[in-house]
Amino acid sequence: MQQEILKIATRQSPLALWQANFVKDRLTEIYPDLTVELVPMVTKGDVILDTPLAKIGGKGLFVKELENALLNGDADIAVHSMKDVPMEFPAGLGLSVICKREDPRDAFVSNRYRTLDDLPPGAIVGTSSLRRQCQLKKRRPDLNIRSLRGNVGTRLSKLDQGDYDAIILASAGLIRLALPERIASFIETEISLPAAGQGAVGIECRINDQRVQKLLAPLADTETTACVLAERAMNNRLQGGCQVPIGGYAVLNGNELHLRALVGALDGSKIIRAEGKSAVENAEVLGIQIAESLLAQGADKILAEVYNG
């Protein structure tokens, strides 16, 4: 019998490779006879580091090359951070599985200060996220927010060199890279609402590839999937990519899904919020309803200013 092989397309950053190896390990644990190979790739988002992502078209910057590998048969699946995955997929591709979520909160990282509120007036804070920027400015208008690009290691190096007083990163990435000690404090979701899908890993494949979909099925996490579907439906209704000042975070209590969302002006002068609850099977409907509530409050005007700015 021929050895069964599964090829995983992945970015080359340490965090992306961790995620790909996480999927590889889970699959080989379930299927000992399966050979899983990584196909590391460089994406546009990895190459263009001197420009804010929103300026080069935020959608799909970290996934397009991986999707091309799926379409031309160079890989069978692609592993992504869910917050980087656009809502629209190329014809023939789709999201097969969302794995169990890591801590979705943002992390406050600093060598000198313990919390966001400990920072002195005018402190320099690094983040590449418009979502984080608007919420930071809302709480601390005095802070000097500066762009910060690159992988986790690069960002930490810039902090350690003294370029910033603090930086904001996803807690999930630091935990996965075995760097939890770099987290000075977790920023609670009431202060910084996470991005849709933050902390979750998704697996994309060809929608007609039933062999692969069957292999992946045991990796799906029901709770994470419901939460992320609600968050992404909200984001999609707002036509938000991964580089917009939109936050969305859902939690599941029993069979009830609770979704909170926001859209903010970049200077923090205005933040529009909405929240609601529904049965878990109505996750995507809830996401759309929350988006409609944000739009009714003027979210579209804020987003238009961001896109046209």
UniProtKB/Swiss-Prot annotation:
**Record NCBIfam families:** hemC
Q: Name one GO biological process term.
A: protoporphyrinogen IX biosynthetic process
UniProt miscellaneous comment: The porphobilinogen subunits are added to the dipyrromethane group.
Keyword match ATP-binding: no
Q: What keywords does the record list, in alphabetical order?
A: Porphyrin biosynthesis, Transferase
Molecular function GO terms recorded: hydroxymethylbilane synthase activity
Named cofactor requirement(s): dipyrromethane
The PTM S-(dipyrrolylmethanemethyl)cysteine maps to 242
Q: What is the name of the protein in this document?
A: Porphobilinogen deaminase
Q: In which pathway does it act?
A: Porphyrin-containing compound metabolism; protoporphyrin-IX biosynthesis; coproporphyrinogen-III from 5-aminolevulinate: step 2/4
This entry carries the following GO cellular component terms, namely: cytoplasm
**What family is this protein classified in?**
Belongs to the HMBS family.
Entry-linked InterPro entries: HemC, Porphobilin_deaminase_cofac_BS, Porphobilin_deaminase_N, Porphobilinogen_deaminase_C, Porphobilinogen_deaminase_C_sf
Record organism: Actinobacillus succinogenes (strain ATCC 55618 / DSM 22257 / CCUG 43843 / 130Z)
- Is Transmembrane one of the keywords? no
**Complexes and interactors:** Monomer.
One Pfam family recorded for the sequence: Porphobil_deamC
